[in-house]
Structures are given as C-alpha cells and as structure tokens.
C-alpha cells in the first residue's frame, strides 16, 4: 500500500468486469476501497450499469482492459464513461491495461477499417477525459486521441524479473525480437539487461499464421529471451523458440505484457521449446488458458503510481522515461 491519505479524498477507482483482481490490487496499493457500482446484463445481452455512490466533482478512474470478450468489455467501458459523465464527475480517467483492436491500426489492404481509431473516437465521444494505457501495440495509437494519453511501459517490470532470477545470468543472454516491428521493445530490454539483441525475420502469410524465415544475431550457447507485447495464438513465439533452439540456444524464455493466449496457445506453449513464459496481469488469465510453465508479474504498482500522479497533477513521465 502506498499510503492512506486518499481514503476520504475525491479520488475514486472503479472496476468493471475485465480484470477485477487487478483493479482490487491497484486500489489496495493506492490505499482506498474500490468504488461501488453494479454491472448487470439483461436477458437479451444488454448491459446495465449503476454507480452506487456519489461521484459529483470527483476524479474517477475506471480500470477496464478491453480483452476477451473484447466487444462486451468495450461496451461496459463506454457505458460506464457515460454514467460517470451524467453523474457529474470532474474528470473521467480510463485505465486500459490492454487496448483491444490495437492491431487494427492501419489499412493493410484496400477497403479495410482502422478500428483502433474508431475505438478511440468512441471513447472520446462517450466522455473520457484521459487514458492511461500500458504497452500499446502501436505507439502511434496515442495520436488517434485528442485527450491526454499516459503510455506506461511493461518492459522494466519484465527486466526486473530476469535480473532477479538466480537461474539467469544476463551476461550469457540474448534478447530476441520475434519480428522487425518489435526491435525497439527488444532494444529497451537489452539495454536494461546489458545484453545483445537478435531479430527473427518472420513472414505471415495470413492472420494467426506465422513462418520463421531467418535469425539475425548471435544465438549459439546463449540463453534466449524472446520479448513481444502480445502473445495471442502463440504461433509466432513457439516457432521462434524452436528456431532459436535449432540455432544452438542453450535455453529459451519468452515474455510479453499482454497474454491474450487464445485458441491453441496453451497447448502450443506447453509443448514448445519455451522453458518459461513470463507475462503480466494486464489481462485476466483463467487457469484453463494459462500454460503450466507460466509466471505472472503484477503491473498494479505501476498503475497505482500513475493514478496517484495524475490525481495529484504531477508528472507521469518518470514512470516510463
């Protein structure tokens, strides 16, 4: 717990159904109770939300990742924003540990939508005044918004785990980006661990199908740490792990901020060359979707610090610079 001075303040933290455990942990760290609200569904699937305490003039923070089921959690968030606006909240700050639709950030083919921008429009129109996000798939998504965005990074949390793990010697490691788009992320982790990096040249013939083509960098005899922002069906990460072992990697670890882990991900990871998968709790992970070799790290402390700094009108940049 960070402190107790916010118990009777105008700071309010609410949780929807996306990740109640994380929201509770954040509230505990801030030192206040979660705000009282009910989230119900009518028999036809419509969502009904009621805020069960006064928030007039309050700085409200709504914690809700738009993870599976994505559309349900997104609608919950939009309805809650509207409820807060109509209840005269002073500010409506949404905390989105995982931003669904972030992978649809551009027109990859003709006649495709840019759904990440559409979601940004919906959030702004509903009435949000600020968003705190964690490891957006494409950092330029911040430019889709006209409201302030505080973009937190999960890499330092992952790096601390590897530095503290007695079974891992950073001097014998190599950080691996599973594609060219993740090089900046891999470089940041490598800079913290003071290790070299490698890049996997990957080509994706169609969605959720990946093919490893080539590895750029020295792998043989080293412990490989693959880092990505999202692991979805785990096709990319497991093919990468096998390619690294084939190139002589001593061991292979994988890590990500957002464990979407859909479809065959659990089985693929458990049957892969990955010794351990390190993820954060940005997405609630049911036990039936969690591979047996998974270790979960908490982002609650990072989010709690961001909330307090926003509430106190202090700089948030110290958390991600």
UniProtKB/Swiss-Prot annotation:
> Which Gene3D superfamilies has this protein been placed in?
3.40.50.2020
Q: List the disulfide bonds.
A: none
Q: Which GO CC terms are listed, alphabetically? A: cytoplasm; ribose phosphate diphosphokinase complex
Using the UniProt record, give the first listed, main subcellular location.
cytoplasm
What EC number(s) does the entry state? 2.7.6.1
Quick one: which residues bind ATP?
A: 44-46, 103-104
Give its localization.
Cytoplasm
Judging by the UniProt lineage, the source's domain of life is Bacteria
Cofactor info, note text:
Binds 2 Mg(2+) ions per subunit.
The alphabetized list of GO BP terms reads: 5-phosphoribose 1-diphosphate biosynthetic process; purine nucleotide biosynthetic process; ribonucleoside monophosphate biosynthetic process
Q: Which family does it belong to?
A: Belongs to the ribose-phosphate pyrophosphokinase family. Class I subfamily.
Name this polypeptide is given? Ribose-phosphate pyrophosphokinase
* Record organism: Staphylococcus aureus (strain Mu50 / ATCC 700699)
